[in-house]
Amino acid sequence: MSKRDYYEVLGLSKGASTDEIKKAYRRLAKKYHPDVSKEENAIEKFKEVQEAYEVLSDDQKRAQYDQFGHAGANQGFGGFGGGGDFGGGFGFEDIFSSFFGGGGGRRRDPNAPRQGADLQYQVTLDFEEAIFGKELNVEIPVEDPCDTCKGSGAKPGTSKETCKHCSGSGQVSVEQNTPFGRIVNRQACGHCSGTGQIIKEKCTTCHGSSKVRKRKKINVKIPAGIDNGQQIRVSGKGEAGVNGGPARDLYVVVHVRNHEFFEREGDHIICEMPLTFAQMALGDEVEVPTVHGKVKLKIPAGTQTGTEFRLKGKGAPNVRGYGQGDQYVVVRVVVPTKLTSQQKDLLREFAGQEEQDDSLFGKLKRAFKGE
C-alpha cells in the first residue's frame, strides 16, 4: 500500500508554517493515541501522524521530502523500494557528493606539491628571562625529505612507476546502487594510496616514505616581555612539504616559572613588601627589589597594611613594543612573634593612651629597632 502524502496526513497545505505543523500534530496525536482512541485502526493512524510530523518538523527532511517525496523523506531512505536502506545510512550527502564531488568536480593532482604540517615546541623560561627576552637554540624532531633518494621514496638509480590499476590518475571508479539508479563514484585507488604511482624498489633509508625522522637545531629569538602561555611563530621551520611543497611553521609555546617574590599581571609586576609596625606607623624609607635593580621607596607615616605603591616603568616591557609596565608594591605589616619585656611594656602603654604623642612613637621606634 502506497504512503499518503504527509501534508494530507496532517490536514495541511504545503505552505504550512512550523506552528501549524505542531498544532496539527498535537491535535491528531491526541485523537489517535491508542490509550484514548476507540477507532479500529487508531494505532496505524497514530504511527502515520508521528512519521509525518517527524519529517515535516525537520527543515532539512522537509526540504528533501518536498523535492523528492517519500524517497527523500529520511536521511537513510528507509522504506524505499520495499525496505532497508542503502549501505546502512547512505544519505543525500553521499549521493550529491557522488554527483558533484569526487567524480564530477575538479580533481586535485595527487602528485602536486603540498605544504607540510605545523609543528609545536614547548619551552620553559625563568621569570627574568621572560621579562628581558633571550635567544634559544632548540632541537626539535622533524620529518625532512630523505637525502638518499632526494625525497622520491625510490631506491637510487630507480624511479616510480605508473600505477596500472588507476592508470596514474590516483582514482578508480566504483559503481553504487542508489534510489536514483546505478551511479559511478570516483574514489582513491587503494593500490597506490591515491598517488597514481607505485614504488617497486623502495629506498633502504626511508623505506619508501620519502621522509626521515631527524632532530634539527633551530635558533629562536624570545622577545622581551613575553608572558606565560604565549607562542612565537618561526616561519618555514615546520614539517617539510610533500612533492617539493613548502614547509609550514614552527610554533614555540612559552611557559614561565613562578618567582618567589614577584607576580605578573600583563605588563605589570606585583610584589608584597613586609614592614614592621613601627615602619608603617612612623614612616620609613625602604629598598624594594625590582627586576631592574633595587629602588628606594618612601613609606609615609600612618600607612595602612594593604596600601599599594606604584613604581612607574619598573614592570615588564610590552611584548609588541608598546611601552613599559609598572611595578606595584603592596605593603603588609609583620607582627612580631617574640617581644622583649621592654617592647611589651611600650605596647601596653601605647594601647592605654588615648593621645599618641611623639615621645611614645620615638620610644616604639627605638624599641622595635633594638636601640
From Swiss-Prot:
<dbReference type="GO" id="GO:0051085">
    <property type="term" value="P:chaperone cofactor-dependent protein refolding"/>
</dbReference>
<comment type="similarity">
    <text>Belongs to the DnaJ family.</text>
</comment>
<feature type="binding site">
    <location>
        <position position="146"/>
    </location>
    <ligand>
        <name>Zn(2+) 1</name>
    </ligand>
</feature>
<dbReference type="Pfam" id="PF00684">
    <property type="entry name" value="DnaJ_CXXCXGXG"/>
</dbReference>
<feature type="zinc finger region" description="CR-type">
    <location>
        <begin position="133"/>
        <end position="215"/>
    </location>
</feature>
<feature type="binding site">
    <location>
        <position position="166"/>
    </location>
    <ligand>
        <name>Zn(2+) 2</name>
    </ligand>
</feature>
<feature type="binding site">
    <location>
        <position position="203"/>
    </location>
    <ligand>
        <name>Zn(2+) 1</name>
    </ligand>
</feature>
<keyword id="KW-0235">DNA replication</keyword>
<comment type="subunit">
    <text>Homodimer.</text>
</comment>
<dbReference type="InterPro" id="IPR012724">
    <property type="entry name" value="DnaJ"/>
</dbReference>
<protein>
    <recommendedName>
        <fullName>Chaperone protein DnaJ</fullName>
    </recommendedName>
</protein>
<feature type="binding site">
    <location>
        <position position="163"/>
    </location>
    <ligand>
        <name>Zn(2+) 2</name>
    </ligand>
</feature>
<dbReference type="InterPro" id="IPR018253">
    <property type="entry name" value="DnaJ_domain_CS"/>
</dbReference>
<keyword id="KW-0143">Chaperone</keyword>
<dbReference type="InterPro" id="IPR036410">
    <property type="entry name" value="HSP_DnaJ_Cys-rich_dom_sf"/>
</dbReference>
<dbReference type="Pfam" id="PF01556">
    <property type="entry name" value="DnaJ_C"/>
</dbReference>
<keyword id="KW-0479">Metal-binding</keyword>
<dbReference type="GO" id="GO:0031072">
    <property type="term" value="F:heat shock protein binding"/>
</dbReference>
<keyword id="KW-0346">Stress response</keyword>
<dbReference type="InterPro" id="IPR001623">
    <property type="entry name" value="DnaJ_domain"/>
</dbReference>
<dbReference type="GO" id="GO:0006260">
    <property type="term" value="P:DNA replication"/>
</dbReference>
<keyword id="KW-0863">Zinc-finger</keyword>
<dbReference type="GO" id="GO:0008270">
    <property type="term" value="F:zinc ion binding"/>
</dbReference>
<feature type="repeat" description="CXXCXGXG motif">
    <location>
        <begin position="146"/>
        <end position="153"/>
    </location>
</feature>
<dbReference type="InterPro" id="IPR001305">
    <property type="entry name" value="HSP_DnaJ_Cys-rich_dom"/>
</dbReference>
<feature type="repeat" description="CXXCXGXG motif">
    <location>
        <begin position="189"/>
        <end position="196"/>
    </location>
</feature>
<dbReference type="GO" id="GO:0009408">
    <property type="term" value="P:response to heat"/>
</dbReference>
<feature type="repeat" description="CXXCXGXG motif">
    <location>
        <begin position="163"/>
        <end position="170"/>
    </location>
</feature>
<keyword id="KW-0677">Repeat</keyword>
<feature type="binding site">
    <location>
        <position position="192"/>
    </location>
    <ligand>
        <name>Zn(2+) 2</name>
    </ligand>
</feature>
<dbReference type="GO" id="GO:0042026">
    <property type="term" value="P:protein refolding"/>
</dbReference>
<keyword id="KW-0862">Zinc</keyword>
<dbReference type="GO" id="GO:0005737">
    <property type="term" value="C:cytoplasm"/>
</dbReference>
<dbReference type="InterPro" id="IPR008971">
    <property type="entry name" value="HSP40/DnaJ_pept-bd"/>
</dbReference>
<feature type="binding site">
    <location>
        <position position="149"/>
    </location>
    <ligand>
        <name>Zn(2+) 1</name>
    </ligand>
</feature>
<feature type="domain" description="J">
    <location>
        <begin position="5"/>
        <end position="69"/>
    </location>
</feature>
<feature type="repeat" description="CXXCXGXG motif">
    <location>
        <begin position="203"/>
        <end position="210"/>
    </location>
</feature>
<dbReference type="InterPro" id="IPR036869">
    <property type="entry name" value="J_dom_sf"/>
</dbReference>
<feature type="binding site">
    <location>
        <position position="206"/>
    </location>
    <ligand>
        <name>Zn(2+) 1</name>
    </ligand>
</feature>
<keyword id="KW-0963">Cytoplasm</keyword>
<feature type="binding site">
    <location>
        <position position="189"/>
    </location>
    <ligand>
        <name>Zn(2+) 2</name>
    </ligand>
</feature>
<dbReference type="GO" id="GO:0051082">
    <property type="term" value="F:unfolded protein binding"/>
</dbReference>
